[in-house]
């Protein structure tokens, strides 16, 4: 048959979304409730008032104060994943999230991660921002840059960390195609399953906004909605709302 038409089954899902959503069931409840979980930019991200001005045209400032942000992004158990506290401190929180959610999507699929050792599990991750490295690594005292800092600053290692965690011998593909990164990751995972490169695939993406510079830049483009909300296909649309999250699917050939 046509290999490009072979069906793919999504057998597991793990996620983190704003509003305290940590499971697929909580995500479904949020969608079905129609609740708006818009919130202020968390106080622990940066000095908000120093970077804010409600006037859209002010150089070097952001004009938005709200968006869709995750809670407790500093919470992580490094020992569970065999990491030292020093390495975990250097690790981009986006990589931490992907490690947690990859484990959870396998549990959701009823797969013991240890059973994948040596197998052809492919990992495909879309990741765009690199705020953590620019904020914590490249702007710090050079004497603080060690082997952990350098490795943890590389976006290209997120997928590889998961393959290392699972001892997988499948593809480890990291993608940055801006807004399409996650959808392309899923597309490539499907191709890998159909081509026989992977017996199982973890695919999705992660996004956290950890520094103000990118938001300032997007505001200077006048691309963000002043009230922080998306109004897709609506006459009142005036930009997009900045959001955060992490989603990974576990898929195999049906």
Locate predicted features.
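Catalytic cores of large soluble enzymes that bind and process phosphate-bearing ligands
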Residues: 19-23, 62, 83-98, 146-154, ...
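Glycine-/small-residue-rich "gating" segment that lines the acyl/pantetheine channel
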Residues: 40-43, 140-149, 156-163, 184-191, ...
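A glycine-rich phosphate-binding loop feature that marks nucleotide/adenosyl-phosphate handling sites
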Residues: 46-49, 119-126, 178-181, 205-208
């Amino acid at each position: 048959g046509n290999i490009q038409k072979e069906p793919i089954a999504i057998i597991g899902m793990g996620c983190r979304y704003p509003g305290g959503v940590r499971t697929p069931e909580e995500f479904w409840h949020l969608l079905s409730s129609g609740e708006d979980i818009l919130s202020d930019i968390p106080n622990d991200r940066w000095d908000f008032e120093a970077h804010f001005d409600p006037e859209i045209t002010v150089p070097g400032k952001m004009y938005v104060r709200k968006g869709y942000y995750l809670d407790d992004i500093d919470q992580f158990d490094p020992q569970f994943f065999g990491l030292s506290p020093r390495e975990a401190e250097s690790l981009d929180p986006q990589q931490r999230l992907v490690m947690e959610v990859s484990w959870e999507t396998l549990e959701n699929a009823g797969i013991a991660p240890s059973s994948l050792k040596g197998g052809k599990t492919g990992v495909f991750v879309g990741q765009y921002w690199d705020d953590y490295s620019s904020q914590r690594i490249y702007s710090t005292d050079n004497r603080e840059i060690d082997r952990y800092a350098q490795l943890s600053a590389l976006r290209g290692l997120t997928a590889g960390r998961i393959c290392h965690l699972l001892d997988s011998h499948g593809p480890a593909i990291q993608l940055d195609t801006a807004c399409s990164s996650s959808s392309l990751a899923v597309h490539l995972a499907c191709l890998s399953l159909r081509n026989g490169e992977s017996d199982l695939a973890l695919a999705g993406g992660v996004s956290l906004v950890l520094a103000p510079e990118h938001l300032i830049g997007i505001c200077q483009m006048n691309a963000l909605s002043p009230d922080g909300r998306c109004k897709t296909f609506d006459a009142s649309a005036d930009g997009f709302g900045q959001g955060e999250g992490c989603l990974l699917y576990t898929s195999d050939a049906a």
